[in-house]
């Protein structure tokens, strides 16, 4: 089973590291091409393109400028420990054992606008480049055209390496759009998380994102290898709703806390 999750905008390069092991991203040549394009942007252009404040635009212009491809533990950190967002609050990778990191390295992938695909222990330097951003490049008008089949091919390599054909899609639509399902040598299972509000179950963004991290952790901690095992997920009050589920979609619900 291969789990896909999105990256996060919030990055942590300060906290103590819980593992010293690392690998290098497999698509750094592509990342370098995107950095070359991004360096052409002025801070005001970055602000407009990413819809961020002038201050954040300045920070990210500096990140593009400072980025260099010789990654070391001194100038980069493991991706799974850098990202800090709702998904990663649920994942809590900072509490992983070395065995957890081993399993995650084989079975978890983070999709990325800049790096394409990241394994948990891949070093990364700080960046902000969301997949949906329309950054013109030599291959087209946006990052989806830039990455083309590259991300899908890399995922197929990972599936072949583990001798499996199931992808658990816990990524956002923006990021999963970078994957070509028809070219993916896998059955795609999408867990959906619904929270009750005023008597109705619906997707509440913050809770759903955190639940994607909780589900990723559940798979990693329990070393799950078959999609039917996912129905046992019960973290923080969620339960599997078979009646609402289908072959490609597993629905989990949680009652409102009263």
Swiss-Prot record:
NCBIfam families: PRK02101.1-1, PRK02101.1-3. Belongs to the UPF0246 family. It comes from Escherichia coli O1:K1 / APEC. Pfam families: H2O2_YaaD (PF03883). One of its GO terms (biological process) is response to hydroperoxide. This is UPF0246 protein YaaA. GO terms for cellular component: cytosol. InterPro entries: YaaA (IPR005583).
